Each structure stands twice: as structure tokens, then as C-alpha cells.
């Protein structure tokens, strides 16, 4: 019996979903409701890549060796420290006759579910990857389940650019939804105050898209918070935020002060897009009572967020960005095409890698 969520691929421990499993069966033979992808490139999530790079002191050979070891041992790419993975692009090799995904052999696709639940085998030893960038050129195969999500790659964008955007496409979609709800609520209540939005890590991939999405959804004032002057200058030049503030997101008072100074008030919506731990308290402190904090970082601690909000007597709603919102891929790609500032930041990041 083949499960639509991939239970039949779980090797150990029995009875858990693929994401929670220690090891998956990555046999290339597919069931009638599965799809096999010939993989051409992985995108490791930022928190996972940072942890690996720091662990090995930037030694690319050691990073590459550990990624290979994780995949061969676990049958998937899931960093055992961060618990996170990433996503991939490739070409459909075979689609089972009962697969509901609508994919056909030859389609070039981006997988929009995490590598942490995707059976994966690497066949080239990652020979073309130097271990120094989040994007990993490779050869191998991956298995999609009936409940997986994939998008056909757009013909007008370079695959590497599409991969970078689709890796974080859940962030702008959820930001857009939350900001639009706040704007609509104030309109219904006759509240003339503009909705203010702070994006922590505003110059990064998810951050830049979230700033663009917030503005499009009706935010009255936005601030992007970045840790270093180079990112401040890049985000200012991109023109995606009404203000750009320099602050360490791990410094709660410093972050809160930077946000409230830039906005004139605490943020109604704070979006956390940084890939380092310890940013929860600052995000809560920077958010107005009745506001919302959206955590998109894989480095977020539930305990730190929940207990921190309680300890600050902060009446805020906290959301975990789960990476999926209906229409998320189309929205992110449309923002990339429509916003030169977003595209410029993405292309500069890819060039630096």
C-alpha cells in the first residue's frame, strides 16, 4: 500500500511521517502515485548551510563530505542539528499513472516541499560543488509523493534564479495575507492609522520578497532591518523599504529601538527572516500590542518565542511560516519580475555565491 504522504518510504522509526523519520527509503522505483525527479541542483536552507559552514570553519571539502554523509545515511537531506533541509530543481523522469501532481516526463520543475521529507540519492558525489554556497549542482534522483508540491520552472528566468526565489516563496505569500488582513480590519473599524511592517533580515531572499509583498498588500510604512552597513546600502539602493535600520537582531533592546525609531511606533507586523538563533525576544519587543510576529527562520525556538512573549506581557499573535500558502510560487515569481529591487538583490547574491 502506498501512502499519499509517503509513509511507505519511512524506514525508521516506524509510524512517523517522512519529515520526522530518521531514515527514508530512496529506492528509485516509484509507486503508481509517485514521481521520480532527476535532480540537477539542491538549495540548502540558510540556517542549515550556516551551521555546516561554521562547524567546519568554512572548509568546503568538509561541508561537502558531511552533506554527502547525511544524504547517504538518512536517504534525505536533513541537517541533524538544525532539522532543516532546503529544496531542489530537476527534470521529471517518470510520473506514476495515479500521481495527482499533473507532471509529465521531461518537465523541468522546482520541488516546493522540503528536502527533509523527500527521498533523495546523490550519484555524482557532489563533484561539481565546492561546499561554499547554498546552491549545490549535482546529479541524482528524488521521489515526490501524491501530497508533494512542485512547480514547472518558468521559461523566462534562469533556473538558478528561480530556485533561489522558490526556496523562500512561502514568506512573501504569508506576509501579504497577514498585512492585507490588518489593512482590511482597520478599514472596517474606521481606524485611519497606516499598518506598519518591520522585516528583520530585509536584504536577504525571504526578507526582500516580504518587504515587496507587504508594500503591495497595503502597508503604510515599512522598515527593513539589517546587521551590517553593506546590506543597509544594498537595501536602501533597492528601494524596497521606506526606511532601513542597522541593528543586531539578537539584541532585543537594540532591535526594538531601531524599529520604533524608524517607524515612529512599534510594528503592527514583524517578519523574522534571519538565519541565526536568538532573535525571538527582539522581534516580540518590536511589535505593538495586538500585532503579529511571523517567524520564517529555521533557527527559531518555539520555547524562546512563547516564553519571551509571556515574560514581556506582550499581547501579540505569533505565526510559524510553514512554507506553503496557496499561490505562493506564482506570487514570488511575479514580485521578482515586477520589482527591480528584488531582482537586483537576488542576482547580486547569486553572483557572490
List each model region and its residues:
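Glycine-rich phosphate-binding loop and adjacent beta-alpha segment
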Residues: 274-339
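C-terminal capping/lid region of NAD(P)-dependent oxidoreductase domains
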Residues: 264, 334-353
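NAD(P)H dinucleotide-binding glycine-rich loop of Rossmann-like/cofactor-binding domains
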Residues: 86, 109-186
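Adenosine-nucleotide cofactor-binding segment
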Residues: 215-277
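Conserved class I S-adenosyl-L-methionine
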Residues: 194-201
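Glycine-rich beta-strand-centered segment in the early N-terminal region that forms part
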Residues: 28-43, 55-115
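Glycine-rich NAD(P) Rossmann-fold beta1-alpha1 loop
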Residues: 169, 201-208, 212
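Residues in the short beta-alpha loop(s) of Rossmann-like NAD(P)-binding domains
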Residues: 203, 227-230, 299, 324
Amino acid at each position: 500500500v502506498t501512502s499519499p504522504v509517503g509513509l511507505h518510504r519511512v524506514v525508521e522509526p516506524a509510524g512517523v511521517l517522512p519529515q520526522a523519520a530518521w531514515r527514508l527509503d530512496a529506492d528509485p522505483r516509484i509507486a503508481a502515485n509517485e514521481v521520480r525527479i532527476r535532480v540537477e541542483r539542491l538549495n540548502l536552507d540558510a540556517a542549515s548551510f550556516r551551521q555546516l559552514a561554521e562547524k567546519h570553519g568554512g572548509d568546503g571539502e568538509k561541508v561537502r563530505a558531511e552533506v554527502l554523509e547525511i544524504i547517504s545515511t538518512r536517504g534525505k537531506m536533513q541537517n541533524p542539528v538544525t532539522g532543516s533541509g532546503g529544496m531542489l530543481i530537476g527534470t521529471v523522469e517518470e510520473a506514476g499513472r495515479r500521481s495527482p501532481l499533473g507532471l509529465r516526463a521531461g518537465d523541468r520543475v522546482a520541488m516546493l516541499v522540503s528536502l527533509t521529507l523527500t527521498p533523495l540519492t546523490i550519484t555524482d558525489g557532489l563533484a561539481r560543488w565546492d561546499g561554499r554556497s547554498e546552491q549545490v549542482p549535482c546529479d541524482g534522483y528524488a521521489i515526490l509523493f501524491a501530497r508533494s508540491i512542485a512547480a514547472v520552472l518558468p521559461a523566462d528566468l534562469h533556473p538558478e534564479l528561480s530556485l533561489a526565489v522558490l526556496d523562500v516563496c512561502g514568506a512573501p505569500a504569508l506576509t501579504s495575507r497577514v498585512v492585507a488582513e490588518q489593512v482590511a480590519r482597520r478599514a472596517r473599524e474606521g481606524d485611519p492609522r497606516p499598518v506598519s511592517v518591520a522585516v528583520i533580515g530585509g536584504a536577504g531572499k525571504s526578507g526582500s520578497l516580504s518587504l515587496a509583498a507587504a508594500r503591495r498588500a497595503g502597508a503604510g510604512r515599512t522598515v527593513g532591518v539589517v546587521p551590517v552597513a553593506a546590506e543597509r546600502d544594498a537595501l536602501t539602493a533597492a528601494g524596497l523599504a521606506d526606511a532601513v535600520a542597522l541593528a543586531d537582531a539578537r539584541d532585543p533592546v537594540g532591535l526594538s529601538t531601531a524599529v520604533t525609531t524608524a517607524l515612529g511606533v512599534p510594528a503592527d507586523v514583524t517578519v523574522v527572516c534571519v538565519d541565526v538563533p536568538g532573535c525571538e525576544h527582539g522581534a516580540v519587543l518590536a511589535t505593538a500590542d495586538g500585532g503579529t510576529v511571523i517567524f520564517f527562520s529555521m533557527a527559531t525556538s518555539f520555547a524562546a518565542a512563547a516564553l519571551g512573549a509571556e515574560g514581556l506581557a506582550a499581547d501579540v499573535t505569533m505565526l510559524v511560516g510553514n512554507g506553503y500558502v496557496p499561490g505562493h510560487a506564482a506570487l514570488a515569481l511575479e514580485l521578482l519580475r515586477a520589482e527591480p529591487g528584488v531582482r537586483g538583490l537576488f542576482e547580486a547574491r547569486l553572483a557572490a555565491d
